[in-house]
Amino acid sequence: MLSKIRPKVKQPLERIGKTLASLGITPNQLTIIGFLITLLASYEFYLQNQILAGIILAVGAFLDALDGALARATGKVSKFGGFLDSTIDRLSDASILFGIALGGLVRWDVTFLTLIGSYMVSYSRCRAELAGSGTLAIGIAERGERIIIIFIASLFNAVKIGVYLVAILSWITFIQRVYEAKKRLEMG
């Protein structure tokens, strides 16, 4: 769903990307910095500091949104950069949920189902696109939406509700993608 507003925020993000480029920061460095900040958010979730964790998570997610803009601003768009960003996103998702579970904020089984659902959203898109479906950026809970849900829930010390919501929406999104991929791939 957030992918629909991406064109509206592209230009402001690219202006910030140009500023970061003038500081000598590379897109891959920004990806790693964002991940390290996300690890700090995970640690704060472990300590049950939900509000602080949510704020730190938002900073890490914002930097994650900037790495692509920085790559475009510097002409450093690369296949490896896309691979690194996507891979680090999966590690970030796991670390956040791990911190939440380790802190006792959500049961492990719910955390596991949430993580698998989140991974299946990403994996189903990747596999469908490799099979020739075209871009499959559909569904009610892509990664951006999932991060926003956890962020907002954290601000209200309600991360448990946020994780349950992410779990449900991730599985719905996965099913939406399977259905859409089937439709597209059987047509082509």
Curated annotation (Swiss-Prot):
Keyword set, alphabetical order: Cell membrane, Lipid biosynthesis, Lipid metabolism, Magnesium, Manganese, Membrane, Metal-binding, Phospholipid metabolism, Transferase, Transmembrane, Transmembrane helix
Pathway: Lipid metabolism; phospholipid metabolism
Highest taxon above the source species: Archaea
Cellular compartment(s): Cell membrane
One Gene Ontology biological process: phospholipid biosynthetic process
Catalytic activity: CDP-2,3-bis-O-(phytanyl)-sn-glycerol + 1D-myo-inositol 3-phosphate = saturated 1-archaetidyl-1D-myo-inositol 3-phosphate + CMP + H(+)
Membrane topology per record: Multi-pass membrane protein
UniProt cofactor note: Binds 2 Mg(2+) or Mn(2+) ions per subunit.
Enzyme Commission number(s): 2.7.8.39
Known function: Catalyzes the formation of archaetidylinositol phosphate (AIP) from CDP-archaeol (CDP-ArOH or CDP-2,3-bis-(O-phytanyl)-sn-glycerol) and 1L-myo-inositol 1-phosphate (IP or 1D-myo-inositol 3-phosphate). AIP is a precursor of archaetidyl-myo-inositol (AI), an ether-type inositol phospholipid ubiquitously distributed in archaea membranes and essential for glycolipid biosynthesis in archaea.
Protein name per Swiss-Prot or TrEMBL: Archaetidylinositol phosphate synthase
Organism, scientific name: Pyrococcus horikoshii (strain ATCC 700860 / DSM 12428 / JCM 9974 / NBRC 100139 / OT-3)
